[in-house]
């Protein structure tokens, strides 16, 4: 693991209450799995605080990375951290920064839904069928529904959809709503609070 950032960027990150983190794989050198960035937001300015070259996407790796970032930022205590929906990273954040409010990134949520559209062979329908496309977009719009109304809104949307949306709704239900079994909802993979 390699972590790098300037004194100024790490200082900026240390003084930022809101952090944003993401990894990318295409630009990582061959001996690493991903390039991970941690950004800070302060006074309307968004700056990359540090970069990390990580060997894999395992929880222990994320924990070690975040502990090092915390040390490099003089034990910074961000109040919120926005991330993609990577379970291992979310778990690591709750270990290293338990006080931080973890927020899921809407862009990554939409990207995840669209990847599922593609993997189920529905990309062509998404491109040509405006009603289908709108219904899929309405699934992602559930992110804007008040927490107490998410399940009801999901159920209403499910009743509204009449076609291939079921494949996407099933995926969304298991991961983000909580699958209905024997009259009770299981916990989703990702909490509604994300």
Label the predicted regions.
Residues 10-11, 27-29, 45-48, 58-61, ...:
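Eukaryotic short linear interaction motifs
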Residues 30, 51-75:
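Active-site beta-loop-alpha junctions of metal-dependent nucleic acid enzymes
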Residues 1-35, 41:
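Structured nucleic-acid-interacting core domains from mobile-element enzymes and related host factors
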Residues 35-38, 47-56:
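A short, conserved beta-strand element enriched in hydrophobic/aromatic residues
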Residues 72-194:
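Extended amphipathic alpha-helical interaction segments
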Residues 26-29, 54-57, 82, 160:
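Conserved, non-catalytic sequence blocks in retroelement Pol enzymes and Pol-derived host proteins
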Residues 21-23, 51, 82-85:
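Short His-Asn-centered micro-motif
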Residues 3, 7, 51-52, 67, ...:
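Short alpha-helical patches at protein termini and domain edges
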